[in-house]
Regions:
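Short, cysteine-centered beta-strand-loop-beta hairpins and adjacent loop/turn segments enriched
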Residues: 77-81, 107-115
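Generic short beta-strand segments
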Residues: 73, 102-108
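Short beta-strand edge/turn micro-motifs at domain boundaries
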Residues: 1, 118-149
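Short beta-strand segments enriched in hydrophobic/aromatic residues
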Residues: 50, 105-107, 137
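Hydrophobic/aromatic beta-strand elements that line small-molecule binding cavities or substrate pockets
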Residues: 87-93, 104, 118-123
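Short, low-complexity N-terminal intrinsically disordered segments enriched in polar/charged residues
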Residues: 1-44, 48, 150-151
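A solvent-exposed, acidic/Ser-Thr-rich amphipathic alpha-helical stretch
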Residues: 43-97
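Short, solvent-exposed coil/turn segments at beta-strand boundaries
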Residues: 46, 94-98, 123-131
Length: 151
């Protein structure tokens, strides 16, 4: 049974807004890291957003800032920086020092038909930079570029 794709957020700025300036800043940090590092593939700028001793819970990327940079360089080309995310963002929320994103994730079943799932990432912010990351990624070979998961 096929399920419909989750609804994508039309207004990213509304998702970035918060009455709490710290939460708004944390959401903006994660959003801009997605735009500049993950979407545009600019690994050299990762240090603007990510701690040197970054803790990574994705089994396909090594620890630390250098692990993120190596992963980005090995999975995607450099692209133009855009004002908004192309990835199908559903929601962006912050609580305390954590920011969570959710995206629509199109996949293919064994017969080649597209179905939709939801991908979640959780980030811990420390001293104005991303210090830790969790996601549901399983070991994969070859490494994937999430920019290929657009609807």
């Amino acid at each position: 049974m096929a399920s419909p794709a989750p609804t994508v957020a039309a207004d990213h700025e509304a998702l970035l807004a918060s009455d709490d300036p710290k939460l708004a800043a944390n959401k903006r940090l994660v959003y801009d890291m997605y735009r500049i590092v993950l979407q545009a593939g600019l690994a050299g700028r990762a240090g603007e957003f990510i701690h040197d001793d970054y803790i990574q819970h994705n089994p396909n990327a090594d620890q630390g800032l250098s692990g993120v940079q190596d992963y980005i360089r090995s999975t995607r080309p450099e692209r133009e920086i855009k004002d908004t995310l192309d990835l199908p963002l559903i929601h962006l929320m912050a609580e305390g020092d954590h920011v969570m994103t959710s995206f629509v994730r199109p996949e293919k079943d064994a017969s080649g038909d597209t179905y939709y799932s939801t991908w979640f990432d959780l980030y811990r912010i420390e001293d104005g930079k991303i210090a830790e990351h969790w996601d549901p990624m399983l070991k994969s070979d070859p490494k994937i570029d999430p920019n290929d998961k657009q609807i």
